[in-house]
């Protein structure tokens, strides 16, 4: 019988742990380290390298080295290596296989079962991809559990206090999660850990802080040498490694020096050297907006749980990125001035918690009960494009819910079940998970057939859906498999703030009309200037053109008020065109004035109203 392990499959680093005598132990890898870089490389000879050895050769093998693949999980992203398309699941499986091999060498016995962690805010496709990676690696995946939950599990085992409410602030290399949990322990030492709420951002992590340093260094080189390194893959890889190191050094020092020789060559053959000093203050200034993105999930969790900051006993920091001083200060600010609890190792605590859960599932530990939640609501599209939710977010899992629906037309022979995940009121604004059809419905007037739709979320957070015609007994079901069905750009987090989204929905039509009107006005005014260049003075043409360009620049952004202001300015400037044309034509006499009136009427024809889409049409789209 093989051993069970817990694996933290991270964006930047991964970690594996197991139970020894009922207690969790981190397993060191073949290189003697307790964490393994989540990097996979393919050597020119075809050998697959994983971990530190892959990371070390990245500069000389840029195109065949893959890092941060976790950010692509659940998408259709692939990388071509020697004619083979590698999916994120397959790349991740190579990391898991390395961890599995090292664990087997350490333990001296086969490793067969694993609990693998994923961000709490991973959607169904991303969770399924994580499970698939484990299967490809030859592991029996006992469970997919959320990283903050695993961290709380590890933390809770050491606590003697009977009841504690903790908030896990998990900022890793590529993802960010916040989870609120209650930990209780009875007189017999039995621990109950229950998740109350969770929120996050699947595209926020230490990689983004690194990228800001890289962008700054690229800009410095361009300013000094006139060389653009943004297309130089080898130079970028060197900058990436230097940026990561600089970020780490700034966690303990107020400044750091980045010194790199022979980064590139100028067109005249001069070597490009880099010698820059980056202060912590400058680093924090250039990443302030990233830090601010951590606020909303924190506040959302408190709102969803219906508690105040004062009701949190401890905030636990998880993930290597929480070592940054600015992050610690933010947590202190959000937590009402209290210092965060730093009693756990942020790099290892998730794997330790996963190992404990593997022991619970295998029966090696019987003193823990873990109750997790689904981070996003699940539902189907009903008439009018409405998202009808069957399972609300933050529902404890496993969970099963059923609801009766009917047909929308007389004698309707089938119904299309379209499954979505998210918090928006309209299905089109949420993430599609899958579609299936229930056929063979007996002829009947609309509203008479009874179609029972059932959602079942297993302990992994993976969704199973079924539909049954209660009249005929016919049934159709599906397991959401995710993966390549979801485009990359649609893996962004699915919920920010439900109230904010409602406000966005109400403003959407107004904002769209404002933008359309502004675009049309800019186009028509520019056309009028071009058609009458010989009749306008240079000053008038320039002032109007400048206003047109200002409006165009505003239209590139999302600030509606800025667009309105720019349009009003252009309307004022555009009046000068009419004044100039009237003045010129007035000088030509009465006939000219008549022509001017005709031209003015023609000018009205140039104004194009924005298209108005009928509400019924919108619902049918």
From Swiss-Prot:
Start-end of Basic and acidic residues biased regions: 499-516
Point to the regions of Acidic residues compositional bias: 603-621
Query: What ranges does the record give for the region Disordered, renumbered to this chain?
Result: 499-520, 583-621
In this UniProt entry, the residues modified to Phosphothreonine are 175
Its Gene Ontology molecular function terms?
ATP binding; ATP-dependent protein folding chaperone; unfolded protein binding
Induction pattern: By stress conditions e.g. heat shock.
Q: Where is the composition biased (Low complexity)?
A: 583-602
Q: Which controlled-vocabulary keywords does the entry list?
A: ATP-binding, Chaperone, Nucleotide-binding, Phosphoprotein, Stress response
Pfam families cross-referenced by the UniProt entry: HSP70 (PF00012)
Domain of life, per UniProt, equals Bacteria
- PROSITE patterns listed in its UniProt record: HSP70_1 (PS00297), HSP70_2 (PS00329), HSP70_3 (PS01036)
Question: Which CDD domains does the protein's record reference?
Answer: ASKHA_NBD_HSP70_DnaK-like
Spell out the family assignment given in the record's similarity comment: Belongs to the heat shock protein 70 family.
Q: What does this protein do?
A: Acts as a chaperone.
Q: Which HAMAP family match?
A: DnaK
This protein is called Chaperone protein DnaK
Source organism per UniProt: Bifidobacterium animalis subsp. lactis (strain AD011)
């Amino acid at each position: 019988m093989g051993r069970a392990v817990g694996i933290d499959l991270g964006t930047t680093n991964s970690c594996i742990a197991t139970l020894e005598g009922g207690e969790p132990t981190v397993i060191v890898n073949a290189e003697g380290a307790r964490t393994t870089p989540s990097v996979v490389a393919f050597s020119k000879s075809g050998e697959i390298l994983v971990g530190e050895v892959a990371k070390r050769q990245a500069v000389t093998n840029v195109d065949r080295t893959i890092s941060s693949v976790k950010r692509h999980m659940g998408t259709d992203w692939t990388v071509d290596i020697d004619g083979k398309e590698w999916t994120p699941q397959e790349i991740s499986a190579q990391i898991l296989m390395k961890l599995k091999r090292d664990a087997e060498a350490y333990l001296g016995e086969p490793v067969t079962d694993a609990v693998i962690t994923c961000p709490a805010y991973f959607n169904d496709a991303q969770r399924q991809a994580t499970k698939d990676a484990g299967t490809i690696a030859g592991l029996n995946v006992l469970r997919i559990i959320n990283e903050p939950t695993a961290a709380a599990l590890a933390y809770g085992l050491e606590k003697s206090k009977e009841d504690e409410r903790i908030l896990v602030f998990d900022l890793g290399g590529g993802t960010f999660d916040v989870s609120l949990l209650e930990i209780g322990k009875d007189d017999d030492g039995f621990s109950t850990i229950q998740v109350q709420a969770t929120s996050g951002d699947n595209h926020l992590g230490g990689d983004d802080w690194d990228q800001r340093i890289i962008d700054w260094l690229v800009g410095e080189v361009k300013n000094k040498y006139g060389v653009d390194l943004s297309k130089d893959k080898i130079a970028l890889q060197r900058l990436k490694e230097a940026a990561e190191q600089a970020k780490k050094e700034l966690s303990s020092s107020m400044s750091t020096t980045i010194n790199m020789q022979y980064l590139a060559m100028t067109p005249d053959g001069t070597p490009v050297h880099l010698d820059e000093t980056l202060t912590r203050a400058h680093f924090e200034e250039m990443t302030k907006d990233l830090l601010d993105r951590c606020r909303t999930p924190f506040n959302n969790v408190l709102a969803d749980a219906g508690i105040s900051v004062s009701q949190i006993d401890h905030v636990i920091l998880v993930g290597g990125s929480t070592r940054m001083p600015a992050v610690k200060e933010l947590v202190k600010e959000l937590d009402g001035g209290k210092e965060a609890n730093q009693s756990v190792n942020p790099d290892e605590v998730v794997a330790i918690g996963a190992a404990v859960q593997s022991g619970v599932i295998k029966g090696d530990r019987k003193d823990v009960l873990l109750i997790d939640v689904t981070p996003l609501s699940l539902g189907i599209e009903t008439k009018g494009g409405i998202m009808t939710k069957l399972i609300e977010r933050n529902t404890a899992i496993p969970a099963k819910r059923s609801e009766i629906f009917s047909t929308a037309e007389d004698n309707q022979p089938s119904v299309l079940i379209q499954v979505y995940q998210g918090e928006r009121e309209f299905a089109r604004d949420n993430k599609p998970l899958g579609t299936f059809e229930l056929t063979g419905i007996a002829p009947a007037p609309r509203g008479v057939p009874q179609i029972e739709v059932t959602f079942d979320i297993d302990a992994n957070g993976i969704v199973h859906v079924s539909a049954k015609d209660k009249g005929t007994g016919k049934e159709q079901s599906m397991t959401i498999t995710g993966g390549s069905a979801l485009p990359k750009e649609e893996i962004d987090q699915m919920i920010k703030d439900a109230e904010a989204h409602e406000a966005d929905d109400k403003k959407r039509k107004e904002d769209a009309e404002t933008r359309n009107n502004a675009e049309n006005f800019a186009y028509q005014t520019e056309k009028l200037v071009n058609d009458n260049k010989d009749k306008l003075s240079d000053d008038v043409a320039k002032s109007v053109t400048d206003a047109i360009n200002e409006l165009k620049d505003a239209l590139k952004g999302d600030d509606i008020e800025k667009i309105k202001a720019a349009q009003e300015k252009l309307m004022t400037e555009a009046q000068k065109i009419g004044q100039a044309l009237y003045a010129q034509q007035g000088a030509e006499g009465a006939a000219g004035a008549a022509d001017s009136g005709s031209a003015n009427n023609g000018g009205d024809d140039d104004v194009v109203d924005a298209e108005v889409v009928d509400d019924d049409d919108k619902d049918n789209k």
